[in-house]
């Protein structure tokens, strides 16, 4: 099984009044990793991908600070449904896990806005890349 990783810079604007990365920014880090995954692994043109985030849950383990410089975000596929993919993520600083997350994406028919089967080429790439 292969895990996709993306290095994301910690920006000054990510820091809140407590001096660490604001909790909402973790979802942005995960989104940045996911969009890179779509481009790098699925070779998908994001302007042509009709997929929405149906749910996300994040468990925070330790704060991330500006001085950490960057985080590594992992992307794994835990489950493939007919029209959905459940992805798991870790946000890491070095070897330390700062957060763990699970996100479910749903493929939509761009005409109706209703769930539609995942594109076969995306399903095949995810199965191959992650050994599903």
Regions found by a protein language model. Name each.
Residues 1-55, 110-132:
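Hot-dog-fold acyl-thioester-processing enzymes
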Residues 7-9, 57-59, 74-76, 90, ...:
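Residue-level recognition of well-ordered beta-strand positions that form the cores
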Residues 37-72, 77-79, 98:
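Hydrophobic beta-strand-centered segment that forms part of the acyl-chain substrate-binding groove
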Residues 65-67, 78-132:
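HotDog/MaoC-like acyl-thioester-processing domains
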């Amino acid at each position: 099984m292969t895990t996709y990783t993306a290095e994301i810079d910690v920006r000054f604007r990510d820091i809140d009044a407590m001096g660490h990365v604001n909790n909402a920014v973790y979802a942005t880090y995960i989104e940045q990793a996911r969009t890179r995954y779509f481009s790098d692994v699925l070779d998908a043109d994001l302007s042509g991908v009709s997929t929405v985030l149906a749910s996300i849950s994040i468990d925070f383990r330790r704060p991330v600070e500006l001085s950490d410089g960057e985080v590594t975000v992992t992307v794994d596929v835990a489950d493939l449904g007919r029209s959905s993919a459940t992805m798991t993520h870790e946000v890491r600083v070095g070897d330390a896990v700062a957060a763990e997350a699970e996100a479910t994406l749903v493929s939509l028919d761009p005409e109706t806005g209703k769930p539609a089967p995942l594109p076969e080429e995306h399903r095949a790439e995810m199965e191959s890349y992650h050994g599903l």
